[in-house]
Swiss-Prot record:
It comes from the Bacteria. This is Phosphoenolpyruvate carboxykinase (ATP). The gene is pckA. CDD domains: PEPCK_ATP. One of its GO terms (cellular component) is cytosol. Involved in the gluconeogenesis. Catalyzes the conversion of oxaloacetate (OAA) to phosphoenolpyruvate (PEP) through direct phosphoryl transfer between the nucleoside triphosphate and OAA. Its cofactor is Mn(2+). Its main location: cytoplasm. PROSITE patterns: PEPCK_ATP. The keyword DNA-binding does not apply. Belongs to the phosphoenolpyruvate carboxykinase (ATP) family. NCBIfam families: pckA, PRK09344.1-2, PRK09344.1-3.
Amino acid sequence: MKMLHRSALLEQLLSSPKTLHQLPASTLVEHALQRNEGILTDSGALAVKTGLYTGRSPQDKFIVDEPMSRDSIHWGATNKPISSEVFTRLKDKVLHYLQQKEVRYASVGFAGADPSFQLPITYLNEFAWHHLFARQLFIREQAPSNNGLEPFTIISAPTFKADPSVDGTRSEAFVIISFEQRIILIGGTEYAGEMKKAIFSVMNYLLPEAGVLPMHCSANTTDEGETALFFGLSGTGKTTLSASEHRRLIGDDEHGWSEKGIFNIEGGCYAKCIGLSKESEPQIWDAIAFGAVLENVVVDPNTGKPDFKSGELTENTRAAYPLEAIPNALLPSVAGPPKAIIFLTADAFGVLPPISKLTKEQAMYHFLSGYTSKLAGTERGITQPEATFSTCFGAPFLPRKPEEYATMLGDKLENDDVQVFLVNTGWTGGSYGTGTRIKLAYTRAMVEAALQGKLDEIETVCDPIFGLYVPTHCPGVPDELLTPRRVWKDEAAYEATALQLAKQFHENFSAFPAAKDSVRLAGPRLA
């Protein structure tokens, strides 16, 4: 492992006897309980609350403006610059703050299951439960390789509150990435998901330099090597749909696509668990055992029983657990190139078909568009679904220009024989508020049919507005459900709503003037 020269203050903190290194999960649970950071549930999981911040705070995320990365960053509302001087000053304040604590936790983990692209990570935490979370989410065993990648260091101090007037932040919370110093600095927020997504942002910057497409997707495969990718924003079903009893899980959220195939960036899963039941998601249910972390799930203090139906603290309730907690997980999580790709969207308008086939040009169009709905709880201030477009189904985590990632996907689709499907896990029979959420059992049936090739010979009809190729039949799904206008009570209302969404697609796509005409024409039709 190539070691970067760290600051003397950071080295001093890491070498201090008050900093506890490489503690196992059992000891971290014990420390968390002793420090009143959480409680045990009846299944042995550690239940914690994250306070004010129950989701990511994207407005408080910054990238340090540095010469080595300046020209490669897509600066804007997502990637906001902060000066190196301001960052270093704040970093030193945080390190001095952690120095005063009675105990800190430090470990080495890794991002990237493929040895050729594995990034070493040192993570330093104020909270025992944050350290447990990171231990379960990052890869724990180093691959037998020496790829020369310099390690990144996460410094997490959730109880340190920044002063915007002094520290140059927007609020008390901050997530700052320095590619030159190889540091991720997090403070003011107890939401552990910030660590996971910051590392993903780092990998989204580093991997393209090695010819690898980083992807916000889940992935699974069969024993025969038929790999599938599931793209989609938070809450669209990536984790749920990739946890199939009939397929081997590669990972639930973050992957790389190299010339050799697919690899997981992480070593664990971070599943949404609002409404979780053993019947609907048995693998996730069983994974919530000792060593797992439950975020913001209401727990009965007398019985220790979690109430997965409750959104009292947030709709964004989460479970973090290691990949090996899934019985059929593929370990190490490396597989061949995909045979099928599924774009997941939770359509709040209720007008997109539950499943449709995409041409290569349509796949590029919908990848660039990244349409879905922001779902309650995944970000602060979101309480109802809201139509949104997130380029490459992961715009908040992309430091580079979207066109770079889209071009890479286009090249992959060109080189491999991959069938792409668009699957709507959102509403049917009406928009949000009047329609109903498509049943998970139906979505599972459609996905299984797509992956098993059962739709290959089924007749399709072209949707007159969206231009999508919709199968007329799918095993296990009512035929009328496949055509949205047939399940709306008011067809005129459907038509108006569909045209409204089509217009939003066109307005959003104006942000990609360099897109080929063949891709632009693959979108919805307004006339």
